[in-house]
Amino acid sequence: MTDVMVVLKVFPEGDETDLEKVANELVSKLPEGYKLVRKETEPIAFGLKALVVYVSMPEKTEGGTDTLEELASSIEGVSHAEVVGITRLGF
């Protein structure tokens, strides 16, 4: 089965949200077959930053990327999360 790379932007509730803590909690909640490949921060506005994570996951996953968005959005300190990119990793 082929994997896909999902680029997920996680928006904090405020500038006091610890994005490193959010990333660690996300990693601990990832289902089997999912893997955090990369993480970075991206400025939004007025000193507020979003967490951008690159997650490898199975292509044929029930619910698609909705599960990943819901999982990230459920973390304390997270306002919401949205998929901003997806690409296939194999042929």
UniProtKB/Swiss-Prot annotation:
Transmembrane segments: none annotated. SMART domains: EF1_GNE. This is Elongation factor 1-beta. PANTHER family: ELONGATION FACTOR 1-BETA. CDD domains: EF1B. Belongs to the EF-1-beta/EF-1-delta family. Pfam families: EF1_GNE. Gene3D superfamilies: 3.30.70.60. InterPro entries: eEF-1beta-like_sf, EF1B_bsu/dsu_GNE, Transl_elong_EF1B/ribsomal_bS6, Transl_elong_EF1B_B_arc. Disulfide bonds: none annotated. The keyword Protein biosynthesis applies. Promotes the exchange of GDP for GTP in EF-1-alpha/GDP, thus allowing the regeneration of EF-1-alpha/GTP that could then be used to form the ternary complex EF-1-alpha/GTP/AAtRNA. The keyword Disulfide bond does not apply.
